[in-house]
C-alpha cells in the first residue's frame, strides 16, 4: 500500500521491538527494523516472535512495519532468505526493504517491496526501472539535490523515500568496499568496519602534507529540518531517520522532533496529512543537539558546501557550555552559560582528541560558576590552560525525562449513545471511519436529576484513559435522561473499545507486491561492473531477464584482485581544502585534478577526482589474506571455529 500522494510518512529506525514501540508512540508513521538475518546491521536483529508481537501494536495506530532484508546474498543463503521472507509475511509485516535483486527471482509471497538505499538510486532511469519491476517505494541517494529529487518523482509512480536525519555514509550507499578490502567485513552485508571514521593524513601528488591526521572521510550528520517543506514540494513522501544502532533516547528524541516539524507543516498547508492515525503529545522538549550527532549538515540538498565534514572528531562532543577556569587534583572549576547537574557528561578537545568525563558532583560556587568533581579525573585535563572551551554531551536532567513515559499517542473516536429504556446502543467511530455498535439490555429509568445524569453519561463514555483512544465528540440521543449505573456504563464502554480495537485491526489493509510493468522494462545498462553488487545466480538471472548482457561479480566474490575504487563519494577533499580546479578555472576542458593520497599508518589510499560529476574515487586493493578467506555468506564461511572443532576426532586417553 503506497503512501497516498498527500500523506507524509515519518519513518523511524528501531534496533529492537521495544524501541520500535516507542518510535510509534512518539509519532512514527512507520518503523524499519531488522529481522533474524540479512538485515544490513550486524548487531541489530530481532526474532520472528518479537516482530509478530510488534505488528498488531503498530497497526492499531495505522503505522507500518518494514523489515530490512537488504544485504547482498550468497547463493548458499538464497533458500534460507526465501524461508525467512515467507515467515515474515506470515507475521503481517507491511514491506521488505531489499538490495539484492535475486530476491525478486525467488518464490516468495506477494509482499510489498521497497528498494533500499544500498541500491544506489541516483538517476531517473534507474528509479523508473526499479518502479517498473515491482518496487512500491524507493530510497533515493542522500547525495541528490532538490532538482534531482523532483525529476525522479515526476518520472515514476513509486513513493519517494529520503533520509532526513542521522549519520551519513561518506560513500554512495552500496558503493563502498573499503571495509571488505581492509578487514574482510562487508558493508554490503551489514558488517562495516567504519574505516571512514579513522584519522588520515592527506598528501598531494608531490608528497606534501595538506592535512595531518584528521578524520577526513568522516561526515557531519544529516539534518534536513530546514528543508522539509522544499522536500515535500520536490515529491518526497517518506521521511526517513537513520539509526538502527541508536539507543531509545535518540529514537524518541529525533522522532518527536520531526513529528512536531511535519505536524506544523501539515497544519499550515491544507493539502497534506499524516500517513497514520492518532495525535501525539510529547512530555519533553525535543532537541536534535542533545542526542548523538557530529555536527549538522543538509549535505547536497541545496548545493555543494565546504563544511560537510566532521574532520576534528567522529565523536559526539555536544554543545559548548562554558570554559574551564582551573584544574585541581580532584576537581575542576568552570564558568558556564547554562546550569550543570550531577551526572552531566562533559568534555574538552585536546589535540583533536575528545577528553570526556562524567560529573559525579557539581556545586555552584558563584554566579554562572561551578565546581565539578568527576567520577574519574582524566590525566589529560591537567594539560589544558585556563579558559579552555568546555562542552556538554550528556544533559542528565534532560535525559532523565526520556527514561520515563515521554509521549502519548491516541486515536480520535466519535461516540454516540442511543436507544431506549430497555436497550442502550453505543456506536464508536474511529478517525479512519471504522465503526462498531454495541448494545446493553436492561431497564434504565428516567433519572431524578436530568442534567446530572446527562453529564454523567457524557463523562463516563469519554473516560478512555486505559485505551489508545480519546473522545473527539460525545453525542447522546436518548428519549430522556436515563440513569445508568457507573459500573455498567464503564463495562459497556470498555467492551465497545475492545470491539473497536478488533474491528480496526480486521479492517487494516497491508500492501502487496506491485506487478511488473507491461511491456517489461529494460535495464539502462548492458554491462554491469562489480559496482552493481551481483553476488548470486538469481541476481544474474534477474538482470539478464531485463536486458543486461555482461555481468561482473560483486566485490565480495574476490574476483577484483587489483586496484579499484573501493569507495566512490560526492565528498571531495580538493573542494574541502580549496584545491578544486573548478574553483580556479572556468573552462571545463582545462579541469584536471592530480591524484592525492590518504595515509593511515601503513595503509595508503590513492584519491582520484572525476571533476565532471564532482566525485572522488578512493582507490585501494583487497588484502591478500582476505582473498584466502571463504566468501562471505557461503556455507564454509558460516561455519564457526567451534563447529569445526566438533568435527575433529576426539583424542584417546
What are these regions (language model features)?
Residues 1-26, 30-33, 37-40, 54-55, ...:
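Surface-exposed amphipathic alpha-helical tracts and adjacent flexible/coil segments at the periphery
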Residues 43-52:
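Aromatic- and glycine-enriched glycan-recognition loops and surfaces
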Residues 99-103:
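Short, polar loop motifs at secondary-structure junctions
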Residues 104-109:
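Short active-site loop/helix that positions an aromatic residue
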Residues 117:
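Residues at the C-termini of beta-strands that transition into short coil/loop
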Residues 122-126:
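Short, glycine/polar-rich helix-capping loops at beta-to-alpha or helix-loop-helix junctions
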